[in-house]
């Protein structure tokens, strides 16, 4: 059913306990993505426990308990269909690797739903997630004002929260006038699949129909080819077969290519996807390809393949805009954590802290700060300890974002805004 529909990755973001999982669960439930036999099993159990009314929240609690017990109904890769799209819900914040995944492209979201609880309004993580979504290039967002049942579906409260959110999203560059704000109750299923009589004052679409107002993400086929290598195999009788996903541009048979920072050249002999030979590969395609002139030891994970005439950019240094997500103390000049960018993991040094920014408005708050701490946004100068490919986020955003990791956690997220390239030839 999904093959002929465009696919979108959807991030569900918002403050803890504002109802993200319940909203995802409810959307899956309403679109028929939670198998009937699971619902039936819960219904029977509910009856046996004397819960005459079968409540959706109870299903969600059970799913949660089962996850805690280690029995997974695969809510990690949650997918559901709308009339227009099929959606995969990518890791929601709260998962440790959410930020890293979002940035390194393991789950680059095309759009987001921001869930905000009506009684609370904008909270700390609401701000952080909105800022991150914007920093990470999510241009389309729908706002679900949840737990409307807790405020008796009061239009006045809805409008107060809407105003607060409009101010917040405007600061980071979303347009409130083009954004849908939907009053919902995920627990009660209000305004999820269809408009409810509980909110006669609300004239917009319910949440699931609203998802079909998202624009289909365009494939960056007009950009130069960039294919970060995930792995490289040596296959007898064929030769070297690198494997990876096309991020931008088009790979064609017969094309002359360069691998950076390995600084090796070759020619594409054949391209394969799902064990079938294809004449060309476009963004989103996971392919294996055979290259004439390349030996197995020449290239490795983290190298990037591009056209010989427009090879991938190797940075000697680069300027980045970063947001510090969590650091036990402070980041100072000389700090050298690992940068995860496309498929590379390279240790890089903070060589200059240029300025601290107001994370919400992007205005300069302080020139040449001495340190950065959790919650700070800044412009910094970075020097990789060994050659690595990174691109300017304005030109090739897919290779311009990165996560900064240290001691097993994501310290910061960022994007490359200028590069001092290394001359490779």
From Swiss-Prot:
It is an enzyme of class 3 (hydrolase). Mg(2+) binds at residue 21. Residues 91-94 are annotated as: G3. Pfam families: GTP-eEF1A_C (PF22594), GTP_EFTU (PF00009), GTP_EFTU_D2 (PF03144). Its EC number is 3.6.5.3. Residues 70-74 are annotated as: G2. Residues 5-221 form the tr-type G domain. Keywords: Cytoplasm, Elongation factor, GTP-binding, Hydrolase, Magnesium, Metal-binding, Nucleotide-binding, Protein biosynthesis. It catalyses: GTP + H2O = GDP + phosphate + H(+). One of its GO terms (molecular function) is translation elongation factor activity. GO terms for cellular component: cytoplasm. Residues 14-21 are annotated as: G1. SUPFAM superfamilies: EF-Tu/eEF-1alpha/eIF2-gamma C-terminal domain (SSF50465), P-loop containing nucleoside triphosphate hydrolases (SSF52540), Translation proteins (SSF50447). Residues 146-149 are annotated as: G4. Residues 185-187 are annotated as: G5. It is found in: Cytoplasm. GTP binds at residues 14-21, 91-95, 146-149. Belongs to the TRAFAC class translation factor GTPase superfamily. Classic translation factor GTPase family. EF-Tu/EF-1A subfamily. GTP hydrolase that promotes the GTP-dependent binding of aminoacyl-tRNA to the A-site of ribosomes during protein biosynthesis. This is Elongation factor 1-alpha. It comes from Methanoregula boonei (strain DSM 21154 / JCM 14090 / 6A8). The gene is tuf.
């Amino acid at each position: 059913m999904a093959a002929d529909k465009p696919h979108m990755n959807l991030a569900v973001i918002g403050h803890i306990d504002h109802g993200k999982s319940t909203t995802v669960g409810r959307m899956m439930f309403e679109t028929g993505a939670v198998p009937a036999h699971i619902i039936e099993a819960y219904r029977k159990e509910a009856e046996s426990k004397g819960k005459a009314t079968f409540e959706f929240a109870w299903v969600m609690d059970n799913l949660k308990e089962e996850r805690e017990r280690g029995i997974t109904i695969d809510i990690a890769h949650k997918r559901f269909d709308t009339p227009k799209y099929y959606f995969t819900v990518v890791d929601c914040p709260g998962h440790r690797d959410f930020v890293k995944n979002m940035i390194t492209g393991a789950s680059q979201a095309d759009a987001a739903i921001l869930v905000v609880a009506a009684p609370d309004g904008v909270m700390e993580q609401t701000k952080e997630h909105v800022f991150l979504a914007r920093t990470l290039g999510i241009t389309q967002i729908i706002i679900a004002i949840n737990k409307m049942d807790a405020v008796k579906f009061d239009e006045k409260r809805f409008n107060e929260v809407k105003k607060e959110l409009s101010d917040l999203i405007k600061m980071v560059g979303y347009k409130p006038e083009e954004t849908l704000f939907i009053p919902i109750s995920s627990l009660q299923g209000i305004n999820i699949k269809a408009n409810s009589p509980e909110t006669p004052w609300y004239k917009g679409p319910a949440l699931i129909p609203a998802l079909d107002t998202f624009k289909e993400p365009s494939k960056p086929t007009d950009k130069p080819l960039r294919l970060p290598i995930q792995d490289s195999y040596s296959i007898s009788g064929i030769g070297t077969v690198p494997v990876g996903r096309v991020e931008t541009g088009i790979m064609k048979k017969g094309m002359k290519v360069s691998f950076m920072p390995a600084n090796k050249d070759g020619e594409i002999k054949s391209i394969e996807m799902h064990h079938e030979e294809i004449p060309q590969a476009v963004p989103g395609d996971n392919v294996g390809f055979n290259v004439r002139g390349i030996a197995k030891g020449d290239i490795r994970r983290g190298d990037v393949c591009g056209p010989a005439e427009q090879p991938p950019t190797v940075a000697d240094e680069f300027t980045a805009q970063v947001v510090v997500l969590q650091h036990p103390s402070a980041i100072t000049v000389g700090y050298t954590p690992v940068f995860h960018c496309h498929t590379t993991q390279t240790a890089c040094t903070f060589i200059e802290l240029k300025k601290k920014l107001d994370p919400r408005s992007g205005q300069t708050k302080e020139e040449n700060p001495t340190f950065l701490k959790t919650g700070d946004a800044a412009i910094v100068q970075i020097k990789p300890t060994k050659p690595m490919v990174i691109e300017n986020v304005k030109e090739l955003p897919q290779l311009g974002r990165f996560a900064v990791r240290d001691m097993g956690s994501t310290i910061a997220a960022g994007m490359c805004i200028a590069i001092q390239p290394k001359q490779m030839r």
